[in-house]
């Protein structure tokens, strides 16, 4: 199976991260930066609710009828997000997700793991397990 342009872009991204990561190359720094960047993603989503208001969160217990099949469940479960991100919030969240991906790629580089291979293996596991791989 040949690699698509998206596969090549992912590997190229990991190579660029390797070239650019200078100051925080220690695995301890990388792990810390992953945690900080994930917090920034969460904070950006929260700000889109609390400061901008373009989206809201309608969090409540979700009902799972006993007679529902596995295929029915995907239609019954809600994201609990109402509305759509405005362009400014979307841009901010995308930027923060990019930062999180940067440090995830840095962790892969530090441990000599291919991010492409990780994603490919996860995709194959999901395809193999199907509904038995609920997350």
Predicted regions and their residues:
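Flexible "arm" and connector segments at domain edges
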Residues: 1-97, 101-135
